A protein has these predicted regions:
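Catalytic core of carbohydrate-active enzymes
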Residues: 449-462, 468-479, 492-496, 500-510, ...
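Solvent-exposed beta-strand/loop surfaces of large extracellular or lumenal domains
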Residues: 77-93, 368, 638-656, 746-765
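Conserved, mostly hydrophobic/aromatic
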Residues: 57, 199, 293, 335, ...
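Surface-exposed interaction regions enriched in Ser/Thr/Asp/Glu
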Residues: 764-772
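Aromatic- and carboxylate-enriched substrate-binding clefts and catalytic-loop regions
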Residues: 70-72, 81, 299-559, 594-598, ...
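Catalytic and substrate-binding clefts that recognize carbohydrates or anionic sugar/phosphate headgroups
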Residues: 2-4, 15, 47, 70-72, ...
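Short, well-ordered beta-strand segments enriched in hydrophobic/aromatic residues
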Residues: 34-36, 57, 69, 102-107, ...
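A low-complexity, Ser/Thr/Gly/Pro-enriched, surface-exposed linker/loop concept
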Residues: 2-43, 49-99, 140
C-alpha cells in the first residue's frame, strides 16, 4: 500500500502513529521487550490518552532476529500460521544501557536507540546493515475504509539490490517494484505470481521474512526509493531479519527455519513428456508418442497424463474416463514395462457434474460460504467447488483417492492450481480466510506429498506443483506455470526460476517450448536446450503436442543431444541436488548468489549458474546471437573446449546443438557412462574432467549415491607443476581428462591417451601424480 504522498505528505485519509520514544525496556526470559510511545512521555500528563507500542525481540535460531511490533494485543489472531522451526534454547545476549537497548543472536543484533531520536538498527558484528529511522514504522489508520495496518521501512544502502519475494517474472532485481503477496493464476507474462513468498534478500548479505500468511504489501525502493516498505492489515507486525553474510548463508538459515527442499528421486531428473492439455489423446496416442521417442532414440523417463484422463466437467474426482481409457490399470502396467514412470494431473477442485459431488457436499468436505451454502462458481469447471483441506475427513477422502491411483501404478502427481482461493468463506477449522488464501497451496501440496511419502516412500516422492507458500519448498518440484511459446516468455520463465531460487526453493522447471500457442521450431529448439539444462525438464503444451518431430527433424536431434548430456551430467547434478536438500542452495541460481563480490553479477537475469561450477546462458534468438558475462577466472566450454577469460562480457553465435555452457577454473567435474537414463550406477566408469587447476589450488569432486550421500571423492591438488590426485571410497574404472592439456612431462600411477578434449589418464589405483 502507498502510505506517503511524496516526501512531505501522506496519502489522503491516513493517520500515522509511530514509536518515537523508548519508555521502558524489560527482559522476559529470552526476549527483549521495548515499550515505545508515539510522543515524549517524560511528563506524566503526556502518559495519558496515548497508544504505547510493544516491541518484542527474540531469536528462533542463531543468526535470526525476530521483531514483533504490537498495537492492540487483544485482536483476533486465527491461523493458519507458517510452520516454522523455532528452537527454544537459542543463545542470546541482551544489553540495556542509557543510550540503547540491544538484542543479539550470533553475529546479528537489533539495537533500539533511546533519547530524542528514535532508530531501530540491525548490525552484523557491530556494523549496521539496515534498520529504520524516526517515523518509518508504526500504525496506519485508514479512515477511507476503516481498516488498520502496521508497517515497517528498512533502509537500502547505495548500490543495494533486492531479490526474491517468490516466483516473479518481472525484472530479477526488485528495486522500484510494488509487490502484493497474493497468489494469483496470472501466467508468466504479468506482475502476478503463483508462488508469493514474503521473503527477500539483498546483495548486502541478509534476508527478511515477514511472518504473515495474508497479503503483505511491499514497496521495494519505490514509494521511498532508499527503503523497503512492507505493510499488513493487522494490529501487529512480525518479521525476521536473517543474517548471512553471503546469499548462500542467508538461504541456509532461511531454509533451516522454514524447511529444507526434499531431495527428489534420481529418475525425476530425466525427460518428462505429456499429453498436453486440451489435445485429443487416448492410449493409442500415448503409445504413438512413446514408441516414436524410442524409434528416434530419444530417451524418455516420465510420461504425464494431463486433465482429460478424467471425464470432462468432473475434475477432480479421480476416475479415469472409461471411453478414452477403458483399461487404465493395464495401460499403466504396459507403460511401466517400457521403463517409464507415470504422472497424472490433479487439482483441489471438483466440478458439479461429478457423481461424487453430492456425497462431498453432504459430508461437509467442500468449502462453504459464511451462510452455510457451498462456495461455487463457473470458472474452470461448471459449478466448481473447492476441497476444504482443513477438514481431516475431507483430507482422508482425497488422500484415499490418491492412494488408489498409486496402487494402480501412478508414481507422482502434478498438483496444479490452488491459487484462486476465495475469502468470502468459512473454513471447517475456523481459519482466517485472508491467511488461508495463500497458505492453501501449502496444505494442498503437503497432503499430496504425504500420500506419496506413505505409499512409495519419501525417497521416491516428487510432485510437479504450481502454487506455493512459505515452506512449500519441502515438496518439490515446482514449475513456472503458463508461458507463451516465444523468446520473451522463455526469458520471463528464467527470471521466475531465478527468483524462486532466491526465495528458498531448490528445484524448478518450466514448460519446454511454451505452454500457450505453438512455438516456431527455432524457439522450441532453443527452449529444449535451456529446459534440459534446468533442474527438471518437461515437454508440455496446451492445444498442441510437444513431441519434437511435430516441429522438424532437427528438433529430434536437439532433444536427443541435450537429454543424453543431462543423463551424463547426473553425477554433478545430483550432488548439487543433495546440497540443495542439505543447505537450501538452489540448483539453478542467479549469478549474484555464486559471485556476491562481483557487482557485475547483481543484475544478470539471462544466464545462471547450474550448481557451483557451470554457467549456462540460454539463447533467446533465432540466429543464435547471445551475450553473456563471465566472472573472474578462466572458463572452458563443457563440450566445445574453448577457453575464455572472465571479468568481461562475451558475444557469440550458436547453432541449435549448442549454447554457452562454461565451466569455471579449478573445477573437477564428473560425467557418467550412461546417456540413456538419469538413474544408473554413477560410480562405475566415471569420467572426471579437470578444468584449469591453478597453482596452490585444490579441486574436489564428490560422486553421489542414489540417496544423496557421497560414495566416492576425488581430489586434485596442484603445487607448482605437480598435480596430485587421490580418490577415496568406492569407484570402478574411472578416468581423468586434463582439459586442454595435450601432454605432460611425467605420470605416476596410471597410463595416458590422447583425446580431442585433453589428455585422458587411466589410473592403476586411486592415486596419481602428474607433472605438467
Amino acid at each position: 500500500m502507498k502510505i506517503s504522498d511524496g516526501n512531505w505528505l501522506i496519502q489522503p485519509g491516513l493517520n500515522l502513529i509511530h514509536p518515537l520514544q523508548v519508555f521502558e525496556v524489560e527482559q522476559q526470559d529470552n526476549e527483549m521487550v521495548v515499550y515505545a510511545a508515539p510522543r515524549d512521555v517524560r511528563e506524566r500528563t503526556w502518559q495519558l490518552d496515548t497508544p504505547l507500542f510493544t516491541l518484542r525481540f527474540f531469536s528462533p535460531q542463531e543468526g535470526i532476529v525476530g521483531v514483533r511490533i504490537e498495537h492492540f494485543q487483544g485482536a483476533l489472531n486465527n491461523g493458519p500460521h507458517y510452520p516454522l522451526n523455532i528452537l527454544q534454547d537459542v543463545k542470546v545476549t541482551i544489553e540495556n544501557t542509557e543510550r540503547y537497548a540491544e538484542f543479539k543472536s550470533g553475529n546479528l543484533s537489533a539495537r533500539v536507540s533511546k533519547g530524542e531520536f528514535w532508530s531501530l538498527d540491525f548490525l552484523r558484528n557491530g556494523e549496521r546493515i539496515t534498520g529504520s529511522q524516526v517515523k518509518n514504522n508504526g500504525y496506519v489508520q485508514d479512515t477511507n475504509n476503516q481498516r488498520n495496518y502496521m508497517f515497517e521501512r528498512l533502509d537500502l544502502g547505495v548500490g543495494e539490490t533486492v531479490y526474491g519475494l517468490g516466483e516473479r517474472f518481472t525484472a530479477l532485481v526488485r528495486n522500484g517494484q510494488t509487490v502484493e503477496t497474493w497468489n494469483r493464476d496470472g501466467g508468466t507474462s504479468t506482475e502476478q505470481a503463483y508462488k508469493n513468498i514474503p521473503f527477500y534478500m539483498t546483495n548486502r548479505g541478509y534476508g527478511v521474512l515477514v511472518n504473515h500468511p495474508q497479503c503483505v504489501s511491499f514497496e521495494v525502493g519505490s514509494e521511498k526509493v532508499s527503503k523497503v516498505q512492507f505493510s499488513v492489515e493487522s494490529e501487529y507486525l512480525e518479521y525476521f531479519v536473517i543474517d548471512g553474510p553471503t546469499p548462500k548463508a542467508v538461504l541456509d538459515r532461511y531454509t533451516r527455519f522454514t524447511g529444507r527442499p526434499a531431495l527428489p528421486p534420481p529418475w525425476s531428473f530425466g525427460l518428462w513428456l505429456t499429453t498436453s492439455f486440451t489435445t485429443n489423446y487416448d492410449e493409442a496416442t500415448v503409445n504413438s508418442f512413446i514408441d516414436g521417442m524410442a524409434e528416434r532414440n530419444l530417451p524418455l523417463h516420465v510420461f504425464h497424463f494431463d486433465c482429460f484422463w478424467m471425464k470432462a466437467f468432473q475434475w477432480c474426482d479421480f476416475e479415469w474416463d472409461p471411453l478414452t481409457f477403458p483399461d487404465p490399470e493395464g495401460m499403466i502396467r504396459r507403460l511401466k514395462a517400457k521403463g517409464l514412470k507415470i504422472c497424472v494431473w490433479i487439482n483441489p477442485y471438483i466440478g458439479q457434474k461429478s457423481p461424487v459431488f453430492k456425497e462431498l457436499q453432504e459430508k461437509g468436505y467442500l468449502l462453504k460460504r459464511p451462510d452455510g451454502s457451498l462456495w461455487q462458481w463457473d470458472k474452470w469447471q461448471p459449478g466448481l467447488a473447492i476441497y476444504d483441506f482443513t477438514n481431516p475427513d475431507a483430507c482422508k477422502w482425497y488422500a484415499d483417492k490418491l492412494k488408489g491411483l498409486v496402487a494402480m501404478g501412478v508414481d507422482c502427481f502434478k498438483t496444479d492450481f490452488g491459487e484462486r482461493i476465495p475469502i468470502d468463506v468459512q473454513w471447517f477449522d475456523g481459519s482466517d480466510p485472508q491467511k488461508m488464501h495463500n497458505h492453501y497451496a501449502y496444505i494442498y501440496n503437503e497432503l499430496v506429498w504425504n500420500v506419496l511419502k506413505d505409499t512409495v516412500g519419501e525417497e521416491e516422492a516428487v510432485l510437479f506443483a504450481r502454487s506455493a507458500s512459505v515452506g512449500a519448498q519441502k515438496f518439490p518440484v515446482h514449475w513456472g506455470g503458463d508461458c507463451y511459446a516465444n523468446y520473451e516468455s522463455m526469458a520471463e520463465s528464467l527470471r521466475g526460476g531465478l527468483s524462486i531460487g532466491l526465495s528458498g526453493f531448490g528445484f524448478w522447471s518450466h514448460d519446454i517450448g511454451g505452454f500457450e500457442n505453438t512455438a516456431p521450431a527455432h524457439v522450441y529448439k532453443r527452449w529444449c536446450a535451456f529446459g534440459l539444462l534446468s533442474s527438471h525438464s518437461r515437454l508440455h503444451g496446451s492445444k498442441s503436442y510437444r513431441v519434437p518431430w511435430a516441429y522438424d527433424d532437427e528438433s529430434c536431434d536437439v532433444v536427443r543431444f541435450f537429454t543424453q548430456l543431462k543423463c551424463r551430467m547426473m553425477l554433478y547434478l545430483y550432488r548439487e541436488a543433495a546440497r540443495a536438500n542439505a543447505r537450501g542452495t538452489p540448483m539453478m541460481r542467479a549469478m549474484m548468489m555464486e559471485f556476491p563480490d562481483d557487482p557485475a553479477c547483481d543484475y544478470l537475469d539471462r544466464q545462471y549458474m547450474l550448481g557451483d561450477n557451470v554457467m549456462v546462458a540460454p539463447v533467446f534468438t533465432e540466429a543464435g546471437d547471445v551475450q553473456f558475462y563471465l566472472p573472474e577466472g578462466r572458463w572452458t566450454h563443457l563440450w566445445h573446449n574453448d577457453e575464455l577469460d572472465g571479468s568481461r562480457w562475451h558475444k557469440q553465435q550458436h547453432g541449435f546443438l549448442s549454447l554457452p555452457v562454461y565451466v569455471r577454473d579449478n573445477t573437477l567435474l564428473a560425467l557418467g557412462n550412461n546417456d540413456q537414463r538419469p538413474d544408473y550406477v554413477w560410480h562405475e566408469g566415471t569420467a572426471f574432467h579437470l578444468f584449469n587447476l591453478q597453482d596452490g589450488h585444490e579441486a574436489v569432486c564428490e560422486v553421489p549415491a542414489a540417496d544423496g550421500s557421497v560414495i566416492f571423492t576425488l581430489k586434485a591438488a596442484r603445487t607448482g607443476n605437480t598435480i596430485t590426485v587421490t580418490g577415496a571410497g568406492e569407484a570402478k574404472n574411472w578416468t581423468l581428462c586434463l582439459r586442454n592439456v595435450v601432454k605432460v612431462n611425467g605420470l605416476q600411477g596410471g597410463s595416458q591417451a590422447e583425446s580431442e578434449q585433453g589428455l585422458v589418464v587411466t589410473p592403476q589405483g586411486n592415486a596419481l601424480t602428474i607433472t605438467l
